[in-house]
Amino acid sequence: MIVYLGMPKCASTWLYDKIKQNFDYDGKKEPHTLVEYGTTNNNLIDFSTNNWSMDSSTALKIDKDVSKYIFIVRDPIELAISYYMQTRLDGESFNDFIFSLVKTKLICFGDIVERWYKLVDKRKILIYDYNKDIQGKHQSFIADICKNLDLDGYDQTVPLQDKIFSTHNKPELKCTDANLNAIIKTQVEKFKQITQG
């Protein structure tokens, strides 16, 4: 089984649509059953973007059936802007949105990878950085991930550079809360230390 651990707004739909032909599964990309019910809805693939937050007991239960986990991160502020443009509530400030992402741990990549490295064999976790490994490098990324997932190929009917969902005319937004910025910086540094150390 292949399990996508995260994050949203990191090309998960694009990747899923490219590789789903390799699996005898015609269900939803994001069934959300691992987080909501503690169980799989199939034994092949789950690209729910909230899988990173599943209970530890669920992770331990399914791990024997998982061949690879995919963890894609992105510059946290860039991710937040894309997510904010898609999901913000009326009147919600960008700082408030960032606060909610930090509070729910969604952009706390250091804490997330630390937890997962303790839960499962870290060699099973494929880690990619959207900004460094995917953006502008679609061909090398798809070749690498297909090799690492032991897949026969990918859907070539749509050009690799075409995205399924793209946020156009993104505004320039900044988090002006020094405490939140410090937390984000600490998380990025922790992530780098854990994954590169």
Language-model regions: role of each:
Residues 11, 112, 191:
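A residue-level signal for conserved active-site and pocket-lining positions in enzyme catalytic cores
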Residues 48-50, 94-104, 132-133, 167-178:
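Surface-exposed cleft-lining segments at the edges of enzyme active sites
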Residues 1-51, 87-92, 140-142, 147-195:
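PAPS-dependent sulfotransferase catalytic core
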Residues 8-13, 31-33, 50-53, 74-79, ...:
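Short, solvent-exposed loop/turn segments at secondary-structure junctions
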Residues 3, 22-25, 56-155:
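PAPS-dependent sulfotransferase catalytic domain
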Residues 38-41, 112, 187:
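Hydrophobic alpha-helical segments typical of transmembrane helices
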